[in-house]
């Protein structure tokens, strides 16, 4: 029987929410060369997978952050899934923009929360943690307490772990890079020869492929 992490990893690969191309790397917006591309929004188009992720995010939140009072989704990738989870848990929902609107009230946080609400932030993907932690900071600046963050997937970069620790934000994820590689190898999506390339990238993503 698959563990939850491997099950989620296999589903992300199945619907091509995660693509692995160690011999034909992608170029990220940051300029980094990467053997992986992740777009978890694709899971929203598949009801069974969408529901699985919703249920597991809700379960993890209930078990890890039992006194949660509200859910925040990080724009844009986690807005839909965050709203689904908030609905399942019967909790208020807001979402956090990457930058303020250029008109109106210039809000970073869209929606309403009671002051000092205990909030769990939902993210679809954790890379370095920079944008995710800005969202957590925005919730704190909104006058609320951030209990932690729950994400569908993380690359597992050491720098991300350090950033979350420094920001004092507890992070829990459903699956990660190692489990994606294991499932990709098991299903024949990648070859054994490619595994080392994939692991080398995670060690030094800034310089890999240059």
Curated annotation (Swiss-Prot):
InterPro entries: OPRT, Or_phspho_trans_dom, PRibTrfase_dom, PRTase-like. Keywords: Glycosyltransferase, Magnesium, Pyrimidine biosynthesis, Transferase. Pathway: Pyrimidine metabolism; UMP biosynthesis via de novo pathway; UMP from orotate: step 1/2. One of its GO terms (molecular function) is orotate phosphoribosyltransferase activity. It catalyses: orotidine 5'-phosphate + diphosphate = orotate + 5-phospho-alpha-D-ribose 1-diphosphate. SUPFAM superfamilies: PRTase-like. Catalyzes the transfer of a ribosyl phosphate group from 5-phosphoribose 1-diphosphate to orotate, leading to the formation of orotidine monophosphate (OMP). Homodimer. This is Orotate phosphoribosyltransferase. It comes from Porphyromonas gingivalis (strain ATCC BAA-308 / W83).
